[in-house]
Regions:
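ABC ATPase nucleotide-binding domain signature region
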Residues: 30-35, 39-93
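ABC-family P-loop ATPase nucleotide-binding domains
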Residues: 10-15, 67, 72-166
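Short, glycine/charged-rich "phosphate-handling" switch motifs in NTP-dependent
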Residues: 193
Length: 194
């Protein structure tokens, strides 16, 4: 379970504090995949960053004993001067994957992303779609109790989207999804609750 306890997040503006959340309390139960929908600026992505530990609340806390992914598809954490292979190696070291486990994850991302020779070129030479494929594949290469997906289904062409959705469905057999999407079809196909 993930519990949000009195979660408060604000950002400074010229007119004072803009509160995204104020004393938000909510529980994401285990074994349930949840879809989050809302208008632009409602705080969905901010919530995902807080749950994933990429940002800290101004007050309150996120409580869990479960493993939680970073927001799937987030490519801003990748190093542009490194190749995709080197970025995968780096993340593997952070998560304790070495030896054959590391090689397995590298193969998974390389095969999943389908970017050919670019896999061994610096990410700064990639299109945004190619970076998204690497980031998405890297996120799926690791096992988590909860996967955070912030508009993750928007990555790539229809064939790649179908492939991504198949991996999501496979992951939900052993893990939970918290999915932010404007696509009601993705929410219906992948989530138990909205």
């Amino acid at each position: 379970m993930i519990e949000l306890v009195n979660l408060t997040k604000w950002f400074p503006t010229p007119g004072g504090r803009h509160y995204v959340f104020r004393n938000l309390n909510f529980s994401f139960p285990d074994r349930v995949s949840i879809g989050l929908m809302g208008r632009n600026g409602a705080g969905k992505s901010t919530l995902m960053r807080l749950i994933g530990g990429l940002d800290t609340p101004d007050e309150g806390e996120v409580r869990t004993n479960n493993s939680i992914s970073w927001p799937v598809g987030l490519s801003s954490g990748l190093q542009g001067s490194l190749t995709a292979r080197d970025n995968v190696r780096f993340v593997c070291r952070l998560y304790g994957a070495t030896g054959e486990a590391m090689q397995e994850k590298i193969r998974f991302v390389q095969e999943f992303a389908e970017i050919g020779k670019f896999f061994d070129m610096p990410l700064k030479t990639y299109s945004s779609g190619m970076r998204g494929r690497i980031s998405f594949g890297l996120s799926m290469a690791f096992s988590f109790d909860y996967y955070l997906i912030d508009e993750g289904m928007a990555t790539g062409d229809p064939i790649f989207r179908k492939k991504a959705q198949a991996v999501f469905k496979e992951r939900t057999q052993d893990a939970n999804l918290i999915l932010v999407s404007h696509n009601t079809r993705d929410i219906q196909d992948l989530c138990d609750m909205v």
